[in-house]
A protein has these predicted regions:
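Residue-level signal for the short linker/turn that defines the boundary of a DNA-recognition helix
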Residues: 26, 35-38, 63
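DNA major-groove recognition helix of helix-turn-helix/homeodomain DNA-binding modules
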Residues: 66-82
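Short amphipathic helical patch at the helix-1/turn junction of helix-turn-helix
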Residues: 22, 32-33
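Short alpha-helical DNA-recognition segment
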Residues: 36-54
Length: 89
């Protein structure tokens, strides 16, 4: 039985940085690799195509937000929206 290509775990990005497309892409790729998942396997587990996962991990524009959320939830990445202060105008 031959082993497939081993996935090299990438470090977790600085999650205290302001939210950006690049940060989300880095976080998804880091979590996937830390779980030892190749792109094909992760895409299958997340219910998206490998092409979509690659686009998201590379920070490509034009991907559906629903796909990003599906991947984040499947990989256990939490997205939190904090309450904001209301302006009294």
């Amino acid at each position: 039985m031959s082993k497939g290509k081993q996935v090299k775990a990438l470090p977790t990005p600085d999650l205290n940085e302001p939210m950006s497309l690049e940060l989300v892409a880095e976080a998804i790729r880091a979590k996937r690799t830390q779980e030892g998942l190749d792109t094909q396997t992760a895409a299958l587990l997340c219910g998206v195509s490998a092409v979509t996962l690659n686009k998201i991990e590379n920070g490509s524009k034009g991907v559906r937000f629903e796909s990003v959320l599906k991947i984040m939830l499947s990989l256990g990445i939490k997205l939190t929206i904090l309450p904001w202060e209301k302006n009294n105008a």
